[in-house]
C-alpha cells in the first residue's frame, strides 16, 4: 500500500523550494505520494518560518491539531522543519514530545534516514546542524512542475541585520558550485521550463566555485543561465543593496531574458533607522542604485520590503520612508509592523510607539504603494506586453492566464496549446489585481534567442566516475 505524505509550508519562496525537494526526496527514496488530507497521511511535515510575529505559537497550535491524529494513529510520523525548528528545536522537543523528527533547512536531505530512525526509536530524532552545501549534493534530480521553476543558488546570510533571524536559522552565506546550478537549470529546461527564478537569502551575494578553481560572480551566472536555450525569462530574489554592483546593473543592458522587475528590500527611508537596523546603506545610496537601473532599463518596475514602527521610529523617520517611496515610485511592497524576533538585537530595543500609530503608519504606507501600483497598471492600457502563459484563468477556465515580466497577470482568450509559451498581448482593461488583453502574436513569430541547448549544457557539466573522481568538459 502506498504511503502518504503531507507537507504544510509557511514562509518564503525558499521554504516553498525546500518543501518541493522534500516531496521529491521522499517520493524517490520511499515511494511516498503527496496528499492534502492529514487524516490519510503516514507522515506529516511542517516547514516553518520564523519571520512573522508569533511564529512559535503558530507552530504549536498546528502541532496540537496533529497530535489528535497521532493519538488515533500511533504510527503517524510528525516532523517539524524550517527556521523555527532550527531556532526552537530543544523547546519543540520538550513542549511537544510527540514530534518524531526535527530538522533544519540545511538537513532536509537527511529526512528519509531520520524518518526510518524515528519509527524504531521512541525519542525525537533531531538534526538542526549546518553542514553547508551538503544538502544540495544529496537531493534527487529536479522535476518540472509547470513552466516556471525556482532554483536555489545559495543559502544563508552574513549581514546580521538587528531585526532578522535568518543568519541564526540558515547560517552564513554559502554558494552552490556553478556547474551544479547550470546542470539543474539545464535539466529543467529539458523538461519544458521557460522561466527560472534564482533563489537566495542574499541572492546577489552569490560567489560560486567553478571547476577550475575560479569564482563565478552573480552577474556572470545571470548571463550563463540566460544563454540556455528554452530559458527565455530570468528572475531572482531576494537581493541586497550592498551587493548590487555596477556589474549586475550592466546585465540589464545586455541580457533581454532578465525581467524588467526587481525586488530590492530597503526596509526604511530614514538613515537613522537604517543604522539601528544595521543596514549597510543610506537612502541616497539606495536611490543611486535605482537611478543606474532605470538608466540601463527605463521600463523597470521596483518592489521592496518595509518595516514600519521599528523601535525608536519618529514621525520624521516615517515621513522619510514615505518620501523614499514616492521618490523611487515603488510598484509593490511587502510591508509589516515591526515584531521582535527572539534572539535578535532589536528584540531588546525599547519601543514606545502606540499601537494605533503603528497601524496608521502601515495603512498610510500601503495606501501610497497601492496608489502607485494602480497608476502603473493604468499606464499599461493600450500597450503591448510579452507574457508567459501559465495555464487556465482562475476567473474563467475558458480563458488563459499569462504573466508579464513586470509581474502582472493578464487574462485573455486563446488556445490551450499556448500554455507554456510566450505571447504578445494588447492590454485592453486594468483591474485591481490583473489585466485583460487580446492576443497579438505567438512565440513562433518572436525569434527568441538560442545560445546553448540544455543537452549541451548538461554535457559540459562536472560528472563523477565510478571512483568518485570529478571531471569537467569545458
From Swiss-Prot:
Residues 378-441 form the TRAM domain. Its main location: cytoplasm. This is tRNA-2-methylthio-N(6)-dimethylallyladenosine synthase. It catalyses: N(6)-dimethylallyladenosine(37) in tRNA + (sulfur carrier)-SH + AH2 + 2 S-adenosyl-L-methionine = 2-methylsulfanyl-N(6)-dimethylallyladenosine(37) in tRNA + (sulfur carrier)-H + 5'-deoxyadenosine + L-methionine + A + S-adenosyl-L-homocysteine + 2 H(+). SMART domains: Elp3. One of its GO terms (cellular component) is cytosol. It is found in: Cytoplasm. InterPro entries: Elp3/MiaA/NifB-like_rSAM (IPR006638), Methylthiotransferase (IPR005839), Methylthiotransferase_CS (IPR020612), Methylthiotransferase_N (IPR013848), Methylthiotransferase_N_sf (IPR038135), MiaB_methiolase (IPR006463), rSAM (IPR007197), rSAM_horseshoe (IPR023404). It comes from Aliivibrio salmonicida (strain LFI1238) (Vibrio salmonicida (strain LFI1238)). [4Fe-4S] cluster 2 binds at residues 157, 161, 164. Catalyzes the methylthiolation of N6-(dimethylallyl)adenosine (i(6)A), leading to the formation of 2-methylthio-N6-(dimethylallyl)adenosine (ms(2)i(6)A) at position 37 in tRNAs that read codons beginning with uridine.
Amino acid at each position: 500500500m502506498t504511503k502518504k505524505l503531507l507537507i504544510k509550508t509557511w514562509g518564503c519562496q525558499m521554504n516553498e523550494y525546500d518543501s518541493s525537494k522534500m516531496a521529491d526526496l521522499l517520493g524517490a527514496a520511499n515511494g511516498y505520494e503527496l496528499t492534502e488530507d492529514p487524516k490519510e497521511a503516514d507522515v506529516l511535515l511542517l516547514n516553518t518560518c520564523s519571520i512573522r510575529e508569533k511564529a512559535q505559537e503558530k507552530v504549536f497550535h498546528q502541532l496540537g491539531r496533529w497530535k489528535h491524529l497521532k493519538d488515533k494513529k500511533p504510527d503517524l510520523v510528525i516532523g517539524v522543519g524550517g527556521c523555527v525548528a532550527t531556532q526552537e528545536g530543544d523547546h519543540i522537543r520538550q513542549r511537544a514530545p510527540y514530534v518524531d523528527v526535527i530538522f533544519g533547512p540545511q538537513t532536509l536531505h537527511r529526512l528519509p534516514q531520520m524518518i526510518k530512525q524515528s519509527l524504531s526509536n521512541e525519542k525525537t530524532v533531531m538534526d538542526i546542524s549546518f553542514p553547508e552545501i551538503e544538502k544540495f549534493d544529496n537531493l534527487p534530480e529536479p522535476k518540472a512542475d509547470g513552466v516556471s521553476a525556482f532554483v536555489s543558488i545559495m543559502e544563508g546570510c552574513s549581514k546580521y541585520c538587528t531585526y532578522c533571524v535568518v543568519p541564526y536559522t540558515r547560517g552564513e552565506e554559502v554558494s552552490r558550485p556553478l556547474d551544479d546550478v547550470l546542470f539543474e537549470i539545464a535539466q529543467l529546461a529539458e523538461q519544458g521550463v521557460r522561466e527560472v527564478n534564482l533563489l537566495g537569502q542574499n541572492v546577489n551575494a552569490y560567489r560560486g566555485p567553478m571547476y577550475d578553481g575560479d569564482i563565478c560572480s552573480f552577474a556572470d551566472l545571470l548571463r550563463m543561465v540566460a544563454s540556455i536555450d528554452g530559458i527565455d525569462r530570468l528572475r531572482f530574489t531576494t537581493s541586497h543593496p550592498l551587493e548590487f554592483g555596477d556589474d549586475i546593473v550592466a546585465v540589464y543592458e545586455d541580457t533581454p531574458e532578465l525581467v524588467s522587475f526587481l525586488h530590492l528590500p530597503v526596509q526604511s527611508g530614514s538613515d537613522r533607522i537604517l543604522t539601528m537596523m544595521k543596514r549597510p546603506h543610506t537612502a541616497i545610496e539606495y536611490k543611486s542604485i535605482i537611478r543606474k537601473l532605470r538608466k540601463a532599463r527605463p521600463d523597470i518596475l521596483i518592489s521592496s520590503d518595509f518595516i514600519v514602527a521599528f523601535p525608536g521610529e519618529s514621525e520624521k523617520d516615517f515621513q522619510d520612508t514615505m518620501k523614499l517611496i514616492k521618490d523611487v515610485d515603488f510598484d509593490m511592497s511587502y510591508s509589516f509592523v515591526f515584531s521582535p524576533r527572539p534572539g535578535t538585537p532589536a528584540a531588546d530595543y525599547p519601543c514606545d510607539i502606540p499601537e494605533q500609530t503603528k497601524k496608521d503608519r502601515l495603512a498610510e504606507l500601503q495606501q501610497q504603494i497601492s496608489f502607485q501600483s494602480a497608476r502603473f497598471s493604468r499606464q499599461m492600457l493600450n500597450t503591448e506586453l510579452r507574457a508567459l502563459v501559465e495555464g487556465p484563468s482562475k476567473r474563467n477556465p475558458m480563458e488563459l492566464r499569462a504573466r508579464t515580466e513586470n509581474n502582472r497577470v493578464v487574462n485573455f482568450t486563446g488556445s490551450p496549446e499556448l500554455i507554456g509559451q510566450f505571447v504578445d498581448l494588447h492590454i485592453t482593461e486594468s483591474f485591481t489585481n490583473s489585466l485583460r488583453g487580446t492576443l497579438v502574436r505567438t512565440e513562433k513569430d518572436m525569434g527568441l534567442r538560442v545560445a546553448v541547448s540544455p543537452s549541451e549544457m548538461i554535457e559540459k557539466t562536472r560528472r563523477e566516475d565510478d571512483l568518485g573522481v570529478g571531471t569537467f568538459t569545458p
